[in-house]
Swiss-Prot record:
Catalytic activity: uroporphyrinogen III + 2 S-adenosyl-L-methionine = precorrin-2 + 2 S-adenosyl-L-homocysteine + H(+)
Protein name: Uroporphyrinogen-III C-methyltransferase
Pfam families: TP_methylase
Residues that coordinate or bind S-adenosyl-L-homocysteine: 12, 87-89, 117-118, 168, 197, 225
SUPFAM superfamilies with a match to the protein in the record: Tetrapyrrole methylase
Main function: It is a step in the biosynthesis of both cobalamin (vitamin B12) and siroheme.
Annotated organism of origin: Pseudomonas aeruginosa (strain ATCC 15692 / DSM 22644 / CIP 104116 / JCM 14847 / LMG 12228 / 1C / PRS 101 / PAO1)
Pathway membership, UniProt: Cofactor biosynthesis; adenosylcobalamin biosynthesis; precorrin-2 from uroporphyrinogen III: step 1/1; Porphyrin-containing compound metabolism; siroheme biosynthesis; precorrin-2 from uroporphyrinogen III: step 1/1
PANTHER family cross-referenced by the UniProt entry: S-ADENOSYL-L-METHIONINE-DEPENDENT UROPORPHYRINOGEN III METHYLTRANSFERASE, CHLOROPLASTIC, SIROHEME SYNTHASE-RELATED
Leading EC class: transferase
GO BP annotations listed: cobalamin biosynthetic process; methylation; siroheme biosynthetic process
Lineage: Bacteria, Pseudomonadati, Pseudomonadota, Gammaproteobacteria, Pseudomonadales
Length: 245
């Protein structure tokens, strides 16, 4: 009898933001396949599982996606409960949809367990509400990294009127800035750069679109980091919003 694959979001980093369903999946797992951006302390929930490191991070040597999928398939066909543990939410730039579809084509049952995405949790940890009545009525989540390195429609995003949350953008700051300015976004549009969201070494830098490159250089911004762009970053909230229950 085949096992099952759980595509689990580990959240942004803070282990207290892990969902109860994710904890149960980890506790019941025979095999846990762990991404690079998962906080190691989260693995305390699966002390008896076999751990397999399948790191994927931009700019670094990564485990091939085909290898990851075939490894999930092999363990599931051997009747094991497999957790594919991903940072953030598996459905936000985490390829969960692709993996679930691939597993289904090969006759393997899977289930997605959502996690809190870094764009939301990082903004909240810095006192930034992504929507705010009268200021921002929508949010656009976008990755600056594409499979074929094709440019994004930054000009259209500049005209969306929503808060922009940019993932995987550290290496493309010049492209982001130029595209948004070309789309008519004002140079004084405020933004926040948030590195290592919700972790003990989280760092934050407030800037604006016109000074993005200068301030990112002075700040020595490094991955993993997100950009939050829009009026909601203008210190609406005077202190970080509590992430605890």
């Amino acid at each position: 009898m085949s096992g099952k694959v759980w595509l689990v979001g580990a959240g942004p980093g803070d282990p207290e933001l892990l969902t109860l369903k994710a904890v149960r999946a980890l506790q019941d797992a025979d095999v846990v396949m762990v991404d690079d951006l998962v906080n190691p302390s989260i693995l305390e929930h699966c002390p008896s599982a076999r751990l397999v490191r399948v790191g994927k991070r931009g700019g670094c040597r990564s485990t091939p996606q085909d290898f990851i999928q075939r490894l999930m398939l092999r363990h599931a066909r051997q009747g094991r409960s497999v957790v594919r543990l991903k940072g953030g939410d598996p459905c936000i730039f985490g390829r969960a949809g692709e993996e679930a579809e691939w597993l289904a084509r090969h006759g393997i049952d899977s289930e997605i367990v959502n996690g809190i995405t870094a764009g939301l949790a990082g903004a909240t940890a810095c006192g930034i509400p992504l929507t705010y009545r009268g200021i921002s009525r929508g949010v656009t989540l976008v990755t600056a990294h594409t499979q074929d390195d094709s440019p994004l429609a930054w000009e259209a995003l500049a005209r969306s009127g929503t808060t922009l949350v940019v993932y995987m953008g550290v290496a493309r700051l010049a492209e982001i800035q130029a595209g948004l300015l070309a789309g008519g976004m004002a140079e004084d549009t405020p933004l926040a750069m948030i590195e290592n969201a919700t972790l003990g070494n989280q760092r934050e830098c407030r800037s604006n679109l016109g000074e993005l490159l200068r301030d990112a250089g002075r700040f020595a911004l490094k991955s993993p980091a997100i950009l939050v762009i829009g009026e909601v970053t203008r210190d609406i909230v005077s202190q970080p919003i509590s992430l605890s229950a």
